Structures are given as structure tokens and as C-alpha cells.
């Protein structure tokens, strides 16, 4: 409780009388005896509706977000009886609670970000791969890494599934505290635009902030690209970051580099020059075995050999290399361990036939679910294609509909054969989603529409030969499909392996 006093004594003097609190939560269903319940207004659900339930379940303290005007007065009156009874739960109205919650949670969990090396990775695409590569590489060099992000949270290789890329302000601080307790000395954390806009990754001590790229996504939330970019930039301009690594091949990255003179620039362009510290590729060659990257940097020159697939992984590898160099790792050891790096589940992941691998197409599963990511995935797959390139994709329901025709146009341009299928339709009519997708094709008659995702994958594998490549885009590591409000088990990898 003492750790909370700097934040709460000014709000209410009686806080000093409270017994030590056990846990901190935003979910009233998780409240146990002696816990601290935080009631935020929320974007969809007002958590203050559940204050009574939290109190009944044994909450020792409630922090409720204060509104302006009548609502605050009503809340104050409603819970005055609890605050008059010194033996009962206390309810404190806190102005701007959402904005300062990360700081309160940090104090509650003894500021765990100060006890390990924390790397925050943001960008539309490449967050997961870059974060996973950073953590994996750190482990190869003798460290003990944890990760937080799209694939899950936990020690590297032992993650638990997470609901959001960036959890709540409380979850982020609690996870970091757990990692410290488990002995982690490093954490690579994906920082989403939602998390930044909602102050969920706020009161953290970042040893390094990484920017991968910016392209269209989440405009159902941010409304404009400018608002989306500004949310991302907060990690570099407003939060506590000791060093920054930015992608200089990205237009927004170049704009931000001009504002951040001490940042490190990463480029895959051999002609790139800058006054910043840098890591750049000077020559890149692809093969069925992976990629070979000759590079120059402010730390020295060398060559990376990796089993990863695709041109965009060149940038991911160089980004991870730059980040670890900034953090003080030895360049020769990084080069030596690079061939041991493995790809990330659902990120250009190869599915190999266990029956007859020599006579089957190469099947790649990738999480690409934005126009930019699909373009990069198809370009990457083309580098390894001797015959025809198939693209199987769909678009999620109840999400940005504007990207659907854009993704269709990209698939038509870059693939030889396209099968449009269902992704996660959620509560939206899959026929409406498909109509939006088909609006993006010039020659609709050449597109196969197969709503059933398993049947779409089966059809492509039956049609393709051993020189062809099949890209199954959109779901990546996910092992479910959301139809209506229900999650059904479905894995692109399992389905492809079944028919190979």
C-alpha cells in the first residue's frame, strides 16, 4: 500500500489506514477479498457499473474514474455510505484515471520495467517478428527473455495467449513484474497504437524504442492516418525512452528521424546515407535456404546468414541487429548466432508435407491482414516461386471495410491465382464482406470464391504443383476462426498439412 501513497494521499487522507492490497484489476469478475478494483469509463463498457459487484466480492479499495459535472456528483453520493464506514471498501474518485493508471499500476508492482531491459516495438507490420527476433537473439547470447504481444505474453517460447497486442495498463505492469520474478533480464514488448492512444504503455522505462513502418490499419478507431501516426509517435516523443531505432525505408520513419537526431537508422538500401548512426544492407541474396545479407553499420561491417524467408525479413533482421547493437551486444557474436534464428509462428511460416515433400507445393502461412502486409508477403513469396503463386485471403468482419478492395487489388496484381475466402467474419454477413473484396478486382471472373476456408486451402493444394507457392494470408498463428461471437478451432497450418 505504501507504494500507492504518492498518488492517493492527496486524493483522500483515509487511504493511509488501509491494509496492504493483494491484487489490482479492471475486471470485477476477478476481484477477491482485499483487492483493488479500478473502474474506468471505457470505450464500450463503463466499468463503474460494476463497482457494487466488486465491493460485494471483497474489494478493499475502488478507484473510479471521475467525470465532469453531474455524473461525478451522482457517483460521489452513491458511494458516500461506503466511505463513511471505515471498515468497508473505500471508493475514491480519480480525475484522468485512465491516463495515470499505468503510473499507479507501476507503483503497485514496484516499477518492474526498471529491473530489466525493456524494448518497445511499434509499427503497422513487423512488430511481432522484430520483437520475437530481439528476444530470441538475446537468449542465444546467454540472456533470459520475455515477450509481450500479438502471439502472447511470457518467457520466450513459453507464452500464454493474450486478448490484445498491448494489454491494459495494469496487465502490462503485472506481466513485467511476473517476468522479473521468473528471472527475465530482457523483455521485447509490442506496443500497439491503441495501447499508446489509451495510455496503457505509459509509465515504463524503455531502454529502446523501435519503429518498423506505418501503413493503413485501425482507421475504424483512429479515423485518419495522421491520428494513427501521432499515436505511434508518442512512444518516441513523450514516453521515457533511452534510445530509438527507426526504419529509414519508411516515409514516416524518415520524417521521425529528422526529429530524433540521436536515433539509429535502419535501411535495406545500399545507397542510404545519413548523419545518424546506422545499419544498412549493401547486398542481399535469396535462396530456398533463406537469405544472405551483407551489411555496413556504425558498429562495423559483416554478413548475416538466416533461414528466414522474404525481403521484408531483411529489414526485420537488420532492425533486431541494430537494436541489440544499441543495447551493447557484440557484433561478431550477433553474426555468429544469426543462422540459429528461427522464424515466428504464422509469419511466412513454411508448412511441409510429411508424406511426399518433394512433389508438393511450398505452402506459406502468414498473418498479413492489411494491404501493405499482403503486398510484402506476396512479394516475399514470389522470390521463392519457380512456377505459379497462389494467394488465399479474406478480410475480417466488423473491422475496417475500406481495406478490403485494396487487398483484392494487391492480390490480383501480385499473385497468379487468387482464392477469396472467409477470414474471421465475426457478426458481419460474409456475403457483404466478399462483395467488398470483389469490388477491388478488375477481372472478377478469374477469382475463385470459396467461403469455406478449409475447402479453399484444399482446392489450392490440389491445383498446385511442386514448383508453385501457396500463400495463405490473414490468420497466421491464430488457431481459431470467429463466426458470429463464437471462436471455432481452425488452424491454417493444420489444414494445409492435412491436404499436403
UniProtKB/Swiss-Prot annotation:
Motif (Meso-diaminopimelate recognition motif): 423-426
Modifications after synthesis and translation: Carboxylation is probably crucial for Mg(2+) binding and, consequently, for the gamma-phosphate positioning of ATP.
Co-factor(s): Mg(2+)
InterPro entries: Mur-like_cat_sf (IPR036565), Mur_ligase_C (IPR004101), Mur_ligase_C_dom_sf (IPR036615), Mur_ligase_cen (IPR013221), Mur_ligase_N (IPR000713), MurE/MurF_N (IPR035911), UDP-N-AcMur-Glu-dNH2Pim_ligase (IPR005761)
NCBIfam families named in the record: murE, PRK00139.1-1, PRK00139.1-2, PRK00139.1-4
Lineage: Bacteria, Pseudomonadati, Pseudomonadota, Gammaproteobacteria, Pasteurellales
Domain of life where this protein originates: Bacteria
Amino acids binding ATP: 123-129
CC per GO annotation: cytoplasm
Name assigned to this protein: UDP-N-acetylmuramoyl-L-alanyl-D-glutamate--2,6-diaminopimelate ligase
Species in which this protein is naturally found: Actinobacillus pleuropneumoniae serotype 5b (strain L20)
Amino acid at each position: 500500500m505504501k507504494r500507492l501513497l504518492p498518488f492517493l494521499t492527496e486524493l483522500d487522507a483515509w487511504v493511509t489506514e488501509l491494509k496492504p492490497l493483494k491484487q489490482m484489476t479492471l475486471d470485477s469478475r476477478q476481484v477477491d477479498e482485499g483487492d483493488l478494483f479500478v473502474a474506468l469509463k471505457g470505450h464500450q463498457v463503463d466499468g463503474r457499473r460494476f463497482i457494487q459487484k466488486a465491493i460485494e466480492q471483497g474489494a478493499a479499495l475502488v478507484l473510479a474514474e471521475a467525470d465532469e459535472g453531474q455524473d461525478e456528483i451522482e457517483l460521489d453520493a452513491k458511494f458516500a455510505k461506503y466511505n463513511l464506514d471505515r471498515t468497508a471498501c473505500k471508493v475514491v474518485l480519480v480525475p484522468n484515471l485512465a491516463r495515470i493508471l499505468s503510473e499507479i499500476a507501476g507503483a503497485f508492482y514496484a516499477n518492474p520495467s526498471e529491473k530489466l531491459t525493456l524494448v518497445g516495438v511499434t509499427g503497422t507490420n513487423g512488430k511481432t517478428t522484430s520483437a520475437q527476433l530481439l528476444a530470441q537473439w538475446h537468449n542465444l547470447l546467454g540472456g533470459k527473455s520475455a515477450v509481450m504481444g500479438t502471439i502472447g505474453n511470457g518467457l520466450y517460447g513459453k507464452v500464454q495467449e493474450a486478448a490484445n497486442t498491448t494489454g491494459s495498463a495494469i496487465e502490462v505492469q503485472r506481466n513485467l513484474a511476473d517476468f522479473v520474478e521468473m528471472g527475465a533480464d530482457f523483455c521485447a514488448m509490442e506496443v500497439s497504437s491503441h495501447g499508446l492512444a489509451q495510455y496503457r504503455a505509459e509509465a515504463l522505462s524503455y531502454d529502446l524504442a523501435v519503429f518498423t513502418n506505418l501503413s493503413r490499419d485501425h482507421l475504424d478507431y483512429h479515423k485518419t492516418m495522421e491520428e494513427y501516426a501521432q499515436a505511434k509517435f508518442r512512444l518516441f516523443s513523450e514516453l521515457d525512452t533511452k534510445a530509438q531505432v527507426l526504419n529509414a525505408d519508411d516515409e514516416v520513419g524518415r520524417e521521425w528521424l529528422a526529429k530524433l537526431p540521436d536515433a539509429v537508422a535502419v535501411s535495406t538500401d545500399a545507397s542510404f546515407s545519413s548523419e545518424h548512426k546506422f545499419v544498412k544492407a549493401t547486398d542481399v541474396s535469396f535462396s530456398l535456404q533463406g537469405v544472405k545479407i551483407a551489411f555496413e553499420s556504425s558498429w562495423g561491417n559483416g554478413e548475416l546468414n538466416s533461414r528466414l524467408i522474404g525481403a521484408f525479413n531483411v529489414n526485420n533482421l537488420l532492425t533486431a541487429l541494430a537494436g541489440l547493437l544499441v543495447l551493447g551486444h557484440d557484433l561478431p557474436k550477433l553474426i555468429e548466432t544469426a543462422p540459429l534464428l528461427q522464424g515466428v509462428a504464422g509469419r511466412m511460416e513454411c508448412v511441409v508435407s510429411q508424406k511426399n515433400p518433394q512433389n508438393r507445393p511450398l505452402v506459406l502461412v502468414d498473418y498479413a491482414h492489411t494491404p501493405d502486409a499482403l503486398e510484402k508477403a506476396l512479394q516475399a513469396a514470389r522470390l521463392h516461386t519457380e512456377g505459379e503463386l497462389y494467394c488465399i485471403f479474406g478480410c475480417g468482419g466488423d473491422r475496417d471495410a475500406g481495406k478490403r478492395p485494396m487487398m483484392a487489388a494487391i492480390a490480383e496484381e501480385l499473385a497468379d491465382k487468387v482464392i477469396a475466402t472467409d477470414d474471421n467474419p465475426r457478426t458481419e454477413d460474409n456475403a457483404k464482406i466478399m462483395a467488398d473484396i470483389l469490388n477491388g478486382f478488375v477481372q472478377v471472373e478469374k477469382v475463385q470464391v470459396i467461403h469455406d476456408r478449409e475447402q479453399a486451402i484444399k482446392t489450392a493444394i490440389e491445383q498446385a504443383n511442386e514448383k508453385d507457392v501457396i500463400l495463405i494470408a490473414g490468420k497466421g498463428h491464430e488457431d481459431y476462426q470467429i463466426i458470429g461471437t463464437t471462436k471455432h478451432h481452425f488452424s491454417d497450418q493444420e489444414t494445409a498439412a492435412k491436404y499436403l
